[in-house]
Regions:
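Glycine-rich, basic loop-to-helix element that forms the pyrophosphate-binding segment
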Residues: 61-78
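A short, conserved alpha-helix in the catalytic core of glycosyltransferases
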Residues: 147, 153-154, 164-194
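Conserved donor NDP-sugar-binding/catalytic core segment of glycosyltransferases
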Residues: 95-127
């Protein structure tokens, strides 16, 4: 059976929130926890003592902040044939993960994007009802804990998370998952959405809000990065994405500002 690494990334003061999956009945599963202090200093021994413990749980500590830096450490150090990225407030569906890995093996996928439910068991957003090949237009709503990758294929591709984006970045604190998938797609790698539930995650998240100036500018810059090298497409794509949010937290004025990154 293929092995799987659960790759967590968090800040030191949130370590105790992590609920690792049961490894007892899965000898080929392991847990890798990457943790940052949020400051120039390393996490303290007292903070690290709150991390989950076990024979197949590894903790790697770093100074500073920036979740994409930690995701890249997860990519570099994962031992499993497959890797699922994890936040400190997510719990996983073991059966769904096993089904996903079998499908990834059968279809020779580099990345599978799956579903997640909220605390009540309701799907967190609208998902396709059948497998769909991912591209730069249909993967913008991806969440970290919805992604499983073939570890060796991604490592061989050289694709990493863009460390200018994601939680901890001063301005562009969103979009790192979307950019990661887009870079894999650009490389011609096999990336699909599959209608399988991977995890449970709280309803509110860093990607839930629209409308503030900071949020609007952060989202606008994501499309420049995804479609870099093309001067027109980022504007057209912002029109399409922004239009869907009109009246749903995005005013007409802010819609126009979003298009032009104002």
């Amino acid at each position: 059976m293929a092995s799987l690494t659960f790759g967590y990334s968090t800040l030191a003061d949130r370590l105790e929130n992590i609920q690792v999956p049961s490894l007892d009945s899965h000898p080929d599963w392991d847990v890798l926890i990457t943790v940052q202090s949020g400051t120039a200093e390393m996490p303290s021994a007292e903070q690290l003592a709150k991390a989950p413990k076990g024979d197949r749980i590894q903790v790697l500590a770093f100074p500073g902040k920036g979740v994409t830096k930690l995701r890249n450490q997860v990519l570099a150090n994962a031992k499993g044939d497959y890797l699922i990225f994890a936040d400190d407030d997510v719990t996983f569906d073991s059966v769904g993960l096993q089904d996903a890995i079998e499908e990834m093996q059968s279809a020779e996928l580099t990345l599978a994007l799956g579903q997640a439910v909220n605390e009540t068991g309701k799907l967190r957003k609208k998902y396709p009802v059948k497998p769909v090949r991912l591209n730069k237009l249909n993967s913008a709503k991806a969440a970290t804990y919805e992604m499983i990758v073939n570890t060796k294929k991604v490592q061989a591709s050289g694709v990493l998370f863009d460390e200018s984006f994601g939680a901890g970045a001063s301005e562009t604190y969103l979009g790192d998952e979307y950019i990661f998938i887009s870079d894999l797609v650009t490389k011609g790698l096999n990336c699909y959405f599959i209608p399988v539930t991977f995890a449970t995650h709280p309803t509110q998240s860093s990607g839930s809000g629209w409308g503030t100036e900071q949020d609007r500018k952060a989202r606008a810059k994501i499309f420049d990065r995804v479609f870099r090298g093309n001067r027109t497409l980022p504007y057209l794509v912002r029109v399409g994405f922004g239009a869907k949010k009109l009246g749903k937290g995005l005013t007409l004025k802010n819609f126009l500002l979003f298009i032009f990154k104002r």
